[in-house]
Amino acid sequence: MIKIYNRKTKAYDVEQVAGLKYINWSYASPIGKSFLELFIKKKMFSKLYGNFCDSSLSKKKIKAFIDEFNIDMSLCNKNIDEFENFNDFFARTLTPEARPIDYSENILISPGDGRLSAFENIDLDKVVQIKGYTYSLKELIDDPKVAEEFEGGTCLILRLCPTDYHRFHFVDSGTCSESKKISGFYYSVNPIALNNVSELFCKNKREWSIFNSDNFGEILHVEVGATCVGTILQTYSPEKRVKKGEEKGYFKFGGSTTILFFKKDTIKIDSDIVEQTKLGFETKVNMGETIGHK
């Protein structure tokens, strides 16, 4: 059972996990682990399932998925019958009113919907993946020189599950470098997997870029793929100015993760998020929601 902190009620909600039986089998049983290493984590598995989700046959899955996970379609720009396939639904866009944004220069917003963890004063060689598990930022982006600039800074991990809005956005106005792609596996990013696969973020397919923000300095933006996420699509134009809240890109089907790194003393994350992280809980947030300040 995965408990998530609800900022509005100040209580814990139980996450409804898509494919829970499959995840438990793959990461906690001997046979499942063998199948995971031989097939599930490989590109071919995610590519095959991705092709299915791109086909018209997958359209039949949409209504059942919406009903099972109680997804509010009133926030979406399309009606159910307008989606061409499951990936079209999965990467759905929302109405502007669905995700209000605070445009104040000193306010930091969430880059997307998901479950947020915040780690301050980070050690580059021991960045927290999940409580009790760490990884190296240098290994994550394969660029020691860039990584060193974020020593002692702040790390935000935004975990998305399959039921979430899967587009990610810029947290401030500014310009962003071209994304660098790093090949890797396709492990799930569910906490069950994070507790069973060491340095998972460094093993999965990922992309990173440097966002030169107007108000929070240089931000290292990392997108991590996961099981069935065969594609991370960047929709922004490198080095072209963007406004706060503009779309940066999106993930195709599957759970996935966005990680942001801030340099030391450039940001202060809201205390409730930091405290919940210390207690071992993620905090549910939506894109555009205030999560910190200068």
Curated annotation (Swiss-Prot):
GO cellular component: plasma membrane
Places the protein is found: Cell membrane
Cofactor(s) of this protein: pyruvate
Family: Belongs to the phosphatidylserine decarboxylase family. PSD-B subfamily. Prokaryotic type II sub-subfamily.
Role of this protein: Catalyzes the formation of phosphatidylethanolamine (PtdEtn) from phosphatidylserine (PtdSer).
PTM section of the record: Is synthesized initially as an inactive proenzyme. Formation of the active enzyme involves a self-maturation process in which the active site pyruvoyl group is generated from an internal serine residue via an autocatalytic post-translational modification. Two non-identical subunits are generated from the proenzyme in this reaction, and the pyruvate is formed at the N-terminus of the alpha chain, which is derived from the carboxyl end of the proenzyme.
EC number assigned by the record: 4.1.1.65
Entry annotated with the keyword DNA damage: no
Matches recorded under NCBIfam families: PRK00723.1, PS_decarb
Catalysed reactions, semicolon-separated: a 1,2-diacyl-sn-glycero-3-phospho-L-serine + H(+) = a 1,2-diacyl-sn-glycero-3-phosphoethanolamine + CO2
Entry keyword set: Cell membrane, Decarboxylase, Lipid biosynthesis, Lipid metabolism, Lyase, Membrane, Phospholipid biosynthesis, Phospholipid metabolism, Pyruvate, Zymogen
An MF annotation (GO) of this entry: phosphatidylserine decarboxylase activity
Pathway noted in the entry: Phospholipid metabolism; phosphatidylethanolamine biosynthesis; phosphatidylethanolamine from CDP-diacylglycerol: step 2/2
GO BP term (any one): phosphatidylethanolamine biosynthetic process
Cofactor binding remark: Binds 1 pyruvoyl group covalently per subunit.
Class of enzymatic activity (EC top level): lyase
Catalytic residues (positions): D113, H169, S256
InterPro entries linked: PS_Dcarbxylase, PSD-B, PSD_type2_pro
Residues the record marks as site: Cleavage (non-hydrolytic): G255, S256
Protein name per its UniProtKB record: Phosphatidylserine decarboxylase proenzyme
Subunit description: Heterodimer of a large membrane-associated beta subunit and a small pyruvoyl-containing alpha subunit.
Modification Pyruvic acid (Ser), positions: S256
Membrane topology: Peripheral membrane protein
Pfam families in UniProt: PS_Dcarbxylase
